[in-house]
A protein has these predicted regions:
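A generic, lipid-embedded transmembrane alpha helix
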Residues: 50-70, 123-127
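Alpha-helical transmembrane segments
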Residues: 2-28, 32-34, 61-73, 79-95, ...
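Hydrophobic alpha-helical hairpins/lids featuring a short glycine-rich hinge
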Residues: 84-120, 125
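Juxtamembrane helix-capping/reentrant segments at transmembrane boundaries
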Residues: 38-52, 224-229
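Function-critical hydrophobic alpha-helical transmembrane segments in multi-pass membrane proteins
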Residues: 151-161, 173-174
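Short juxtamembrane and helix-loop transition motifs at transmembrane-helix boundaries
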Residues: 17, 41-45, 73-83, 132-142, ...
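Membrane-interfacial loop-to-helix junctions in multi-pass transporters
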Residues: 88, 143-153, 260
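Membrane-helix interface "capping/anchor" motifs
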Residues: 103-111, 165-173, 221-223
């Protein structure tokens, strides 16, 4: 067995424990401060639910990543981590997105402020050298110059970030889709031998599993149920957008050339990405505002067919 797999497993366990410890603390804090997601005619839930579950995501992921590399490198050795410009840009970007999500959950922010923060955060990545530089023959296009790849990268990351945020409408949906996508990217990077990213992804998977337990299986009456809020959905979406660009980028120094990299990356995110396009086109056709919340998402349609939240989640 490859010794690096122990790093991945250890990061998952550390993050899982961290999430299991942090989330109950967050629930108590939300109830004390009365920080709830209030029900309305558009939302599915009918009781006040704490909404700050996503606060646990980034600290747990980074804690698991750092501890795994520090502890196991001393015990097992072999893994070296270099902090390059890409890494610095990602860390700064994810902290911006995470902070915006937390502030939005606490006091509320307008969509323009969040969109600006997403755009600026995404822009840091191509400025650091990480951008979509090859379409691998899609529409007959191969190599992509920076002046096209940079705005395309920003668009893709913001698009994915908002797609996951907008589909967060029933218990476990955004988290479940993100979990499957993260697991897919984990296998992709594992196959390419890019173990540093595998450890990072595993660190996010662990806390996400802990969150999904509280979100899906805990009843509101138990006072243990929680939503991820924008702090969670925006963070997850941005990480997935970053992984999309990282895996799709043609960089022989990091990974072997694969003509299906772009297609595979999109396939892992096809449900939220396709749903947001379908909803936008539907609103456009109906002459309604594109960004006004409604009940046009796929989970709303399944619920109207008589499915329960858990059945709709399983169907999607």
């Amino acid at each position: 067995m490859n010794v690096y797999i122990y790093y991945v497993i250890f990061a998952f366990i550390i993050s899982l424990i961290s999430g299991a410890v942090l989330i109950p603390v967050i629930i108590k804090f939300c109830r004390k401060r009365k920080l709830y997601d209030l029900p309305d005619t558009r939302k599915v839930h009918r009781m006040m639910i704490p909404r700050l579950g996503g606060i646990a995501f980034l600290p747990s992921m980074l804690f698991a990543f750092i501890v795994s590399l520090f502890v196991l490198s001393r015990v097992l050795g072999g893994m070296e981590v270099t902090i390059g410009l890409w890494s610095c840009a990602f860390i700064v970007s994810i902290f911006i997105i995470y902070s915006v999500g937390v502030v939005d959950d606490l006091i509320g922010l307008g969509p323009k402020v969040k969109f600006l923060a997403q755009t600026l955060s995404a822009l840091l990545l191509p400025l650091s050298g990480l951008y979509i530089n090859n379409l691998y023959g899609f529409l007959g296009i191969w190599d992509v110059p920076f002046y096209i790849g940079a705005p395309l990268t920003v668009f893709v990351i913001v698009y994915i970030d908002n797609a996951l945020n907008l589909i967060d409408g029933i218990d476990g949906l955004a988290g479940g889709l993100a979990l499957m996508s993260l697991f897919g990217f984990l296998l992709c990077f594992m196959r390419e031998g890019v173990w540093t990213y595998c450890v990072l992804i595993s660190g996010l998977i662990g806390v996400l599993v802990a969150y999904l337990y509280f979100n899906i299986f805990c009843k509101p009456e138990s006072n243990r149920k929680i939503f991820m809020g924008d702090s969670g959905s925006l963070t997850l979406g941005f990480v997935l957008g970053f992984l999309f660009v990282k895996f799709a980028m043609d960089n022989s120094k990091v990974m072997t050339y694969r003509s299906d990299s772009l297609l595979l990356s999109y396939t892992l995110l096809i449900v939220p990405c396709f749903d947001v396009v379908r909803v936008m086109l539907s609103r456009l056709w109906a002459g309604q505002p594109l960004f006004k919340a409604d009940k046009r998402h796929i989970h709303h349609k399944l619920l109207r067919c008589g499915l329960s939240q858990h059945c709709a989640l399983a169907s999607i």
